[in-house]
Amino acid sequence: DCIDRYPDLFVGLASADLSKPMEGVRELRKYVKEHDFKGLRIVQWLWDKPCTDPLYYPLLAECVELDVPVCLQVGITGPLCTSRTGQPSHIERIALDFPELKIVCGHIGAPWHEEMIVYARKFPNVYIDTSAYVPKRYPKALVDFIKGSGKHKVMFGTNFPMLMPADCLKQLDILELDEETTQLFLHDNAKRVFKL
């Protein structure tokens, strides 16, 4: 409803039932083709399965066919459940298996953020978003990556309503990004990856 009413403000990401991957493929295809959704979002810990589980693979292949990214949570979980599903090493496997798949890794990858940065640097199809973290909590290694070789690889995110965009944007000056990097971080990287 929000997407239909405010198409200049909102875009959709599809979700999928991993227990029925082929039904999920059909739903993903429908939402991308009929409703202009821009990607697939899967929170691995909800399913207690890492993204390397075979149930993901039909959906990942369909993302490649539709040329939309998959957005995954990478890092420790907030709820009291295992964080093993969000370890960055799983991203390496799917990046190798699906080199054409755009993979957006949410939540920075903390506490394994340095490993996450290595994979974003290593694979042209792997990206990081900063959702669930305010700028003052970004690890120094991530800020250095944004300012350097990773300026085309990291996207601003908030995980709204957990964090309010305005509150995160107020802290942006802490990062001391130049104008070009700020534009990439806040806008251009997401525009390119999600084809906005």
Located regions from the model:
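His/Asp/Glu-enriched short active-site or ligand-binding loop at hydrolase and phosphoryl-transfer sites
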Residues: 126-137
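Glycine-enriched alpha-helix->loop->beta-strand junction motifs that scaffold or abut catalytic
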Residues: 34-39, 62-69, 97-101, 120-127, ...
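Active-site gating/metal-coordination segments in enzymes
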Residues: 1-72, 76-85, 122, 136
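Structural detector of well-ordered beta-strand residues that form the stable sheet scaffold
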Residues: 11-13, 71, 104, 127-129, ...
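Short acidic/histidine-rich active-site segments
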Residues: 107, 129-131, 145-166
